[in-house]
UniProtKB/Swiss-Prot annotation:
Coiled coil: none annotated. This is Aldehyde dehydrogenase 1A1. The modification Phosphoserine is found at residue 413. Keywords: Acetylation, Cell projection, Cytoplasm, Lipid metabolism, NAD, Oxidoreductase, Phosphoprotein.
Length: 501
C-alpha cells in the first residue's frame, strides 16, 4: 500500500492471547458442527499458537442461511440508509485503528510478517481501504435513460446478494478488507473463509464487526480448509457471487464449481510471473531498489512479485552486482525482533516448493550469485537468493516461486523484451524503468498486464483498480471498478402518458 505520513512503530505486544477461535455466524461464536479443530502455527518458530474450530460444509450452510436471512427485503440491512452503511464501515476502521497494535502483532506471529511492515503497511492499508469504501456507500447510483417512446427508464445498482469470499494467507487481514469493504459498501452480505494457515486476524475482525454495529448475519466467518469449506462456498446453490485471491490452480476449481452449481458470479485474483523491464537509460539506483523490493518484499510471497527481471545488456553486469550487494544486506530472524529484515515462509509446503525451484535453477544452468538454500535450525527461513544468466526456458523463469528468489535476465531490443515479457500465461502486473516517456508509454501499452508501474513497483492504493489479464484472473478489486463486481444493474421502464425533454 502506498502511504504518506507514517506513524511511529511501537514495540509488538508480548504474551498475546488468542480470544477468538470459533466460527462467527449471526454475530455469535459457534463450535464446528463436526466438533473438529485445526492447529495454527507460528512459521518463525514452528510452535502451535492455538487451535481453531474447523468449519465444513454444514457450517458453511449455516453461515449462508444467516447471510441470506440478513439480505431479505425488509431486513435491517436492506432498509438501512446507504450513508449509514458508510458510517458502520468508518466505525469499523476506527476499531481497527484502536486495535492496530494487537492486529499487527497477530499478523507477524501467525503470518511471518515483519512487525513493522504489518503495523505500517498492512494495517495502514486496511484502514485506508475501509475509509475509501465507506465513502462510496452513498455514491453507488443508477441513471435515467432517454428511451424512445412514451416511457420513463432508469437503472438501479442493486447488491448482488450473498457473497462468498475466500482469503489468501499472504495478506490475511488486508485481503479480508479488500473483500468485505466493497461488498458491504454496496449492501451485500458475506460468508468469509480465511486461509487455514492464517485465520486469527479474520476471527478478531468478527468481534469488531459486532462491536461496530453491523446487523447479525451481514458478515459471517468460517475458518477451514479449501477442499472442504472453500469448496462448499464455491459450489453452494444459495451463494450469488464468490471472490477468491490465491493460486491459479485453485481459481480454476472455483470457476468450475461455480459453473456446475448456480453459475454464480466469480472474481479471481490469481498468480503472477510479473516482468520488470530495466532500460539502460533508467535511474539505476532507483531501478535496483524498486526491483529488489518488488521481489523480496514479504519474503517474495506476493502475487505481483517482480519475478522476471529483464535488464538491458549494456547495464546488465552492473545491475547484477548492485542487486547482489543489496540482497546480502538482509538480517533473517523472528519478524517480531527489531532489526530483522526477512522473516520465514508461511509453511513447510511452501518452503519445500521454493527450495525445489532454487535447485532447478542451479541444475538448469543459471548462475547462483548469492543465497540458494535454507537458513537457521528452526522456522521456514530461506536465504535471499539471486540468479543471473537466467534463460526464459528455465523453471525459475516460468513458474511462480513465491519466495525470496530474484532471477535476472538480459535483453537487447525493445521489441524482443516486449515479446518475452508477454510470453507467459500470467498477466497480473509489470514494471518499466526508463527516463524516456515515449518508451514508457509504448511499452506500457504493449504489456499484457492489469497494472503497469513506471519507475516504481508495487505501488497499490485503494483508489486504483487491481486485477489481472489472462490466467492471473478476472474482475477488479478496489477503485470505482471494484464496486461493479458487487452490484447488479436493473433496468426499470415505466409507461407514461407523454414524454417531454
Amino acid at each position: 500500500m502506498s502511504s504518506s505520513a507514517m506513524p511511529d512503530v511501537p514495540a509488538p505486544l508480548t504474551n498475546l492471547q488468542f480470544k477468538y477461535t470459533k466460527i462467527f455466524i449471526n454475530n455469535e461464536w459457534h463450535s464446528s458442527v463436526s466438533g473438529k479443530k485445526f492447529p495454527v502455527f507460528n512459521p518463525a518458530t514452528e510452535e502451535k499458537l492455538c487451535e481453531v474450530e474447523e468449519g465444513d460444509k454444514e457450517d458453511v450452510d449455516k453461515a449462508v442461511k444467516a447471510a441470506r436471512q440478513a439480505f431479505q427485503i425488509g431486513s435491517p440491512w436492506r432498509t438501512m440508509d446507504a450513508s449509514e452503511r458508510g458510517r458502520l464501515l468508518n466505525k469499523l476502521a476506527d476499531l481497527i485503528e484502536r486495535d492496530r497494535l494487537l492486529l499487527a502483532t497477530m499478523e507477524a506471529m501467525n503470518g511471518g510478517k515483519l512487525f513493522s511492515n504489518a503495523y505500517l503497511m498492512d494495517l495502514g492499508g486496511c484502514i485506508k481501504t475501509l475509509r475509501y469504501c465507506a465513502g462510496w456507500a452513498d455514491k453507488i447510483q443508477g441513471r435515467t435513460i432517454p428511451m424512445d417512446g412514451n416511457f420513463f427508464t432508469y437503472t438501479r445498482s442493486e447488491p448482488v446478494g450473498v457473497c462468498g469470499q475466500i482469503i489468501p494467507w499472504n495478506f490475511p487481514l488486508l485481503m479480508f478488507l479488500w473483500k468485505i469493504g466493497p461488498a458491504l459498501s454496496c449492501g451485500n452480505t458475506v460468508v468469509v473463509k480465511p486461509a487455514e494457515q492464517t485465520p486469527l486476524t479474520a476471527l478478531h475482525m468478527g468481534s469488531l464487526i459486532k462491536e461496530a454495529g453491523f446487523p447479525p448475519g451481514v458478515v459471517n466467518i468460517v475458518p477451514g480448509y479449501g477442499p472442504t469449506a472453500g469448496a462448499a462456498i464455491s459450489s453452494h446453490m444459495d451463494v450469488d457471487k464468490v471472490a477468491f485471491t490465491g493460486s491459479t490452480e485453485v481459481g480454476k476449481l472455483i470457476k468450475e464449481a461455480a459453473g456446475k452449481s448456480n453459475l454464480k458470479r466469480v472474481s479471481l485474483e490469481l498468480g503472477g510471473k510479473s516482468p520488470c523491464i530495466v532500460f539502460a537509460d533508467a535511474d539505476l539506483d532507483n531501478a535496483v531498489e524498486f526491483a529488489h523490493q518488488g521481489v523480496f518484499y514479504h519474503q517474495g510471497q506476493c502475487c505481483i512479485a517482480a519475478s522476471r527481471l529483464f535488464v538491458e545488456e549494456s547495464i546488465y553486469d552492473e545491475f547484477v552486482r548492485r542487486s547482489v550487494e543489496r540482497a546480502k544486506k538482509y538480517v533473517l530472524g523472528n519478524p517480531l525482533t527489531p532489526g530483522v529484515s526477512q522473516g520465514p515462509q508461511i509453511d513447510k509446503e511452501q518452503y519445500e516448493k521454493i527450495l525445489d525451484l532454487i535447485e532447478s535453477g542451479k541444475k538448469e544452468g543459471a548462475k547462483l550469485e548469492c543465497g540458494g538454500g535454507p537458513w537457521g535450525n528452526k522456522g521456514y527461513f530461506i536465504q535471499p537468493t539471486v540468479f543471473s544468466d537466467v534463460t526464459d526456458d528455465m523453471r525459475i523463469a516460468k513458474e511462480e516461486i513465491f519466495g525470496p528468489v530474484q532471477q535476472i535476465m538480459k535483453f537487447k531490443s525493445l521489441d524482443d523484451v516486449i515479446k518475452r515479457a508477454n510470453n507467459t500465461f500470467y498477466g497480473l502486473s509489470a514494471g518499466i524503468f526508463t527516463n524516456d516517456i515515449d518508451k514508457a508509454i509504448t511499452v506500457s501499452s504493449a504489456l499484457q498486464s492489469g497494472t503497469v508501474w513506471v519507475n516504481c513497483y508495487s505501488v497499490v492504493s485503494a483508489q486504483c483498480p487491481f486485477g489481472g489479464f489472462k490466467m492471473s484472473g478476472n474482475g477488479r478489486e478496489l477503485g470505482e471498478y471494484g464496486f461493479h463486481e458487487y452490484t447488479e444493474v436493473k433496468t426499470v421502464t415505466i409507461k407514461i402518458s407523454q414524454k417531454n425533454s
